[in-house]
UniProtKB/Swiss-Prot annotation:
<comment type="similarity">
    <text>Belongs to the UPF0125 (RnfH) family.</text>
</comment>
<dbReference type="InterPro" id="IPR037021">
    <property type="entry name" value="RnfH_sf"/>
</dbReference>
<protein>
    <recommendedName>
        <fullName>Protein RnfH</fullName>
    </recommendedName>
</protein>
<dbReference type="InterPro" id="IPR016155">
    <property type="entry name" value="Mopterin_synth/thiamin_S_b"/>
</dbReference>
<dbReference type="Pfam" id="PF03658">
    <property type="entry name" value="Ub-RnfH"/>
</dbReference>
<dbReference type="InterPro" id="IPR005346">
    <property type="entry name" value="RnfH"/>
</dbReference>
């Protein structure tokens, strides 16, 4: 019989944070943890084909195996490109 592990799945919005604790079979993947959390049903804006995921702020793939105590994070897409914002600020400063 395979051992059980407990992981947390997190998704944060500016106004609300979701943190679900799930129990899985040892050897479960990031995707299985996310699906078991129920967040895909709660938040229709999460698309695993588009949203990046990670474990403790380190980018990972949906097929990667989770370990007991991991925190799986679902990241929202960037609203603005940081490089573009820096370029715009630099241009604005140069024009002063």
């Amino acid at each position: 019989m395979s051992a059980k592990i407990v992981v947390e799945v997190a998704y944060a919005l500016p106004e609300k944070q979701y943190l679900q604790r799930v129990t899985l079979q040892e050897g479960a993947t990031v995707e299985e943890a996310i699906r078991a959390s129920g967040l895909l049903e709660l938040r229709t804006d999460i698309d695993l084909a588009k949203n990046k995921v990670g474990i403790y702020s380190r980018p990972t793939k949906l097929a990667d195996v989770v370990h007991d105590g991991d925190r799986v994070e679902i990241y929202r897409p960037l609203i603005a490109d940081p490089k573009e914002l820096r370029r715009q600020r630099a241009e604005k400063s140069a024009n002063k």
